[in-house]
Every structure is written in C-alpha cells, then in structure tokens.
C-alpha cells in the first residue's frame, strides 16, 4: 500500500499551517479561559454591589420598622428591592433545575442571631460573601451570597454561549485565511526552488545554456546566481573540451600525415630507405612524442597530480642554470640572452617544477623571437611578492592575442605559429605551475617590441606561513 508522500511544497505548507493551527487553538483557549475567569469575576463584583445595595436598603427599612417582622414570610419585599436597581435582570426566567425565584439560591438575609429571614432552605455556605446590615453603627443582621463558581443566570449563560460560538467562528475563519496565506506563501517561497530544480534537470540532460533569473537578494537569489555561474562554467568547459579534441586531432594529423606519406613513398619505391629518410621519420616521431609528453604534463598539472616537493628555493641560481643551458641555442639563432638579477631571491616552491617553468618560458622566446633579437630576464621583489620578467623582442602580438596566450594549443598568426615547432601547450603548463605556487602569470607588450611574460610569486616566508 502506497502512502502519500508530500513534496517540499506540501511539507512546507503542512509545517506552516500546522504551526498556525496550534497557535490559533492555543490563543483561543487562552482567551476562553481568560474570558470565563474575567466574566465570573465580573459577576462576583456585581453580586458584591447588589449585596451592599440590599444591605443598605434593608438597614433603612429596619430603622423605620424597628424589627424584622416586616420581612418575615415576605420574600417578595426583598425581590422588589432587588428589582428596583436591577431592571434588566428582573425579567429573567430561572435556569434549568432552579426554583422559580432563582435569586434565592444566591442570597440569604439573616438577623443578628444568624436566623434565616429570607432565602432558600439550603445551608448557608461558610465561604459565602457576607455584608452586615448596620443601623446606627450596630449590626442587626446580614446579607449573605453563595460563592460564584459557575454561571447560573440565563442571561449570563446565553452571553457566554454566544461568545463561545463567536470565538469558534473566528477560529474557523482564521484557519481558512491561514490555509490560504500558507498556500500562497509556500508557492511564493518555493517558486525559485522549482525553477532551480527544472534548471538542474536541464543541466543533467546536457543543456548547459540553461539559466535562471534571480528574483530576490536572499539565499535563494544567491543560489540562483551560483547556479548560473555553474551553468556558465559547464558551458565553457564543454566548448573547451570540444576545442581541445579538435586541436589534438589537428596537431596529431600533421605529423601522422607526414609519416604516412614518407612510408608510402618508401613502399612505392618513390624514395629510397636512406639515413636521411630515417632522420626525417625520426623527426616526425619526435614531434609526436613531444606533443604526447606535453599533453601528459598538462593533464597532470590540470588535475594537480604533479608531485610538488616544496622547500625554500633561491630563484637566482635556478635562472642562471636555465639560461646557461639555452645560451648556446640562443647564440645559434643570433639572439642575445641578457640578465638583470639581484644576488638572491628565495621562494617556497618545487625546484624541478620551477626549472620546468623557466625552461618553457625560455623555449617560448627562443622559438618565436626573430633572429637578431634579444630576451631580457629581470627579477626583483615588491612588498611581499617576487616578480620575474621575461621580455623578448619582435614580433609582438595584439591586445586580443595577449589574453589568449595561456590557452592550450593557441598560437598567434605570423611568425609565432606552428612553423616554429611548438605544440601550443608550453604556456598553458606554465600557468598551471605558477598557480600551484599561489602565484600568477601575466602577458603584456614588451618594451623591446615583443611579448613580456611576468611571473609573480609570494616570498618564501609568506608561502611557508600559509603551508
């Protein structure tokens, strides 16, 4: 047997509505109890006033007659006195189970010896309200009223019944209004959630163009903004993945096509299998190997899988070693390699990965700088940051191209292209290495007409404190 399981809208509605019902019923009973107690106190106060009036009136009559004979067997006389100041209640009919004269169950008139002159035959309650009848300061009798523990007069009972019915009617109307308000409130509060749920389903189905419109500035509005950011990131990653696969296919196609052409030429007898042919094939295989290695390094750096063994590292000897390894290659192309370095700058990092960073930057300038140019490497520190600058000479790039230099497989047109032999992954790997060291890498126009790559890294003491 399946039971109804409410959704989040139903649960929110039930929670708010149940709270409203509990509050309404609690308030109703609190008001009822307060009303009944207050009403009984009001009746008690009225009885006390009637007792006092009756006591004063009987005292005047006693002073005129000098005794209580006028009152014996004359209950109607007391009734007439009460009727004189209680016109509204004089026509009331006795309640159920009460004698014809309902007032007799409430009042007794006794003389100075506590002998009952007027009143019911029932015993006088010891906790009744007593008002003495005074004549010239002497007590000649008393008027006694039974304690009020419940409503006995029809007027009071009917009034209490009417108030009870009215209060329940108010509770019923308030319940309907609470249900309507709760329903509208639940729908209003959960409408953004429903839009987010629908958007999530679309994202799960692969529609990364889905966006939701934030309708408030609260937590749900912030969640909608985060959802849109997530969708935008997924859409961007999807496009990058497509471009990445297309770029890989393109990069692999050229060396494979050359290899295939060379092998088919040898197979058809067009070319002879000579050492020169073997060298050509090895060059293409080397290109493929370099591309695969770069892809492997990039994928590991993307996932943070590169093993970073961080320790205090002096960058100056590291730069000098890297520059020394490239000096002969720079000279063979007619390029000048110049350094402007301080004696020592220490950072907290991985020596091997920093060497890989410098090698990639040197390789980038070597491949893409025109012959007869130069590369200026400078270093310094400002505040708590180490700044390394690799500024080469022409050719330069446009402002738009500067923003794309660190994208994988990106190459500029002109002399900075595939003809130079690069895979377009070196600067992307540099970006990952720098970010792994809590730094940043920036491309700008070089004062020498080429490109200036600036690497900013935290000083050794700041990074070590963070670790």
From Swiss-Prot:
Per its UniProt record, what Gene3D superfamilies does this chain match? 1.10.287.130, 6.10.340.10, Histidine kinase-like ATPase, C-terminal domain (3.30.565.10)
Residue ranges, Cytoplasmic side:
1-11, 187-467
Q: What happens when the gene is disrupted?
A: Loss of induction of the CRISPR-Cas casABCDE-ygbT-ygbF operon.
**Example of a GO biological process term:** cellular response to cell envelope stress
Query: By its UniProt entry, which InterPro entries does this protein fall under?
Result: 2-comp_sensor_kinase, HAMP_dom, HATPase_C_sf, His_kinase_dom, HisK_dim/P_dom, HisK_dim/P_sf, Sig_transdc_His_kin-like_C
Q: How is it modified after translation?
A: Autophosphorylated.
Q: Which domain of life is it from?
A: Bacteria
What reactions does this protein catalyze?
ATP + protein L-histidine = ADP + protein N-phospho-L-histidine
Query: Which GO cellular component term is one of those annotated?
Result: plasma membrane
| Disulfide pattern | none
The record's subcellular location field reads: Cell inner membrane
Which residues are reported to carry the modification Phosphohistidine?
250
Main subcellular location: membrane
The molecular function GO annotations come to: ATP binding; phosphorelay sensor kinase activity
Q: Which residue numbers delimit the HAMP domain?
A: 187-239
| Membrane-crossing residue ranges in chain numbering | 12-32, 168-186
Q: What class of enzyme is it?
A: transferase
Outcome of mutating residue 192 to L, per the record? Increased expression of periplasmic chaperone Spy
What are its E.C. numbers?
2.7.13.3
The residues covered by the Histidine kinase domain are 247-461
SUPFAM superfamilies assigned: ATPase domain of HSP90 chaperone/DNA topoisomerase II/histidine kinase, HAMP domain-like, Homodimeric domain of signal transducing histidine kinase
- Kindly state which keywords UniProt assigns to this record, in alphabetical order: ATP-binding, Cell inner membrane, Cell membrane, Kinase, Membrane, Nucleotide-binding, Phosphoprotein, Stress response, Transferase, Transmembrane, Transmembrane helix, Two-component regulatory system
Q: Which PANTHER family match?
A: PHOSPHATE REGULON SENSOR PROTEIN PHOR
What's its job?
A: Member of the two-component regulatory system BaeS/BaeR which responds to envelope stress. Activates expression of periplasmic chaperone spy in response to spheroplast formation, indole and P pili protein PapG overexpression. Activates BaeR by phosphorylation which then activates the mdtABCD and probably the CRISPR-Cas casABCDE-ygbT-ygbF operons.
Protein's name in the database: Signal transduction histidine-protein kinase BaeS
Species whose genome carries this gene: Escherichia coli (strain K12)
Give the source lineage, highest ranks first: Bacteria, Pseudomonadati, Pseudomonadota, Gammaproteobacteria, Enterobacterales
Q: Name the gene.
A: baeS
């Amino acid at each position: 047997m399946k039971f109804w399981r409410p959704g989040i809208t139903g649960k929110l509605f039930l929670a708010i509505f149940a709270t409203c019902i509990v509050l309404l019923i609690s308030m109703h009973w609190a008001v009822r109890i307060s009303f009944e107690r207050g009403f009984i106190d009001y009746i008690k106060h009225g009885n006390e006033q009637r007792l006092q009036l009756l006591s004063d009136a009987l005292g005047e009559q006693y002073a005129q007659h000098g005794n209580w004979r006028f009152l014996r067997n004359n209950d109607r006389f007391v009734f007439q006195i009460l009727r004189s100041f209680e016109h509204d209640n004089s026509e009331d009919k006795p309640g159920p189970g009460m004698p014809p004269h309902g007032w007799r169950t409430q009042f007794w008139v006794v003389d100075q010896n506590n002998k009952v002159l007027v009143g019911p035959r029932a015993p006088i309650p010891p906790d009744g309200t007593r008002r003495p009848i005074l004549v010239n300061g002497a007590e000649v009798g008393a008027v006694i009223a039974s304690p009020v523990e419940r409503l006995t007069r029809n007027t009071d009972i009917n009034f209490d019944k009417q108030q009870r019915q009215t209060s329940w009617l108010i509770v019923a109307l308030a319940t309907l209004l609470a249900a309507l308000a709760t329903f509208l409130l639940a729908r209003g509060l959960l409408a953004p959630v429903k839009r987010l749920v629908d958007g999530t389903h679309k994202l799960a189905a692969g529609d990364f163009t889905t966006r939701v419109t934030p309708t408030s500035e609260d937590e749900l509005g912030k969640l909608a903004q985060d959802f849109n950011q997530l969708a935008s990131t997924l859409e961007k990653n999807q496009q990058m993945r497509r471009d990445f696969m297309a770029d890989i296919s393109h990069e692999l196609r050229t060396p494979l096509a050359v290899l295939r052409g060379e092998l088919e030429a040898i197979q058809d007898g067009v070319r002879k299998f000579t050492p020169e042919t073997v060298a050509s094939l090895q060059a293409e295989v080397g290109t493929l190997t370099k591309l695969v290695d770069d892809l492997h390094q990039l994928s590991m750096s993307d996932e943070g899988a590169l093993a970073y063994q961080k320790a205090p590292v002096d960058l100056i000897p590291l730069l000098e070693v890297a520059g020394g390894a490239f000096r002969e290659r720079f000279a063979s192309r007619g390029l000048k390699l110049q350094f402007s370095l301080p004696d020592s700058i220490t950072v907290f990092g991985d020596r091997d990965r920093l060497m890989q960073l410098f090698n990639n930057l040197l390789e980038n300038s070597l491949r893409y700088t025109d012959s007869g140019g130069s590369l200026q490497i400078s270093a310094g520190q400002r505040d708590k940051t180490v700044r390394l600058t690799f500024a080469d000479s022409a050719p330069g790039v446009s402002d738009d191209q500067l923003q794309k230099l660190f994208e994988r497989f990106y190459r500029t047109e002109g002399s900075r292209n595939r003809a130079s032999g690069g895979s377009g992954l070196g600067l992307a790997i540099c970006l990952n290495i720098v970010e792994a060291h809590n730094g940043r890498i920036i491309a700008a126009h070089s004062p020498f007409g080429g490109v200036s790559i600036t690497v900013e890294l935290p000083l050794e003491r700041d990074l070590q404190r963070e670790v």
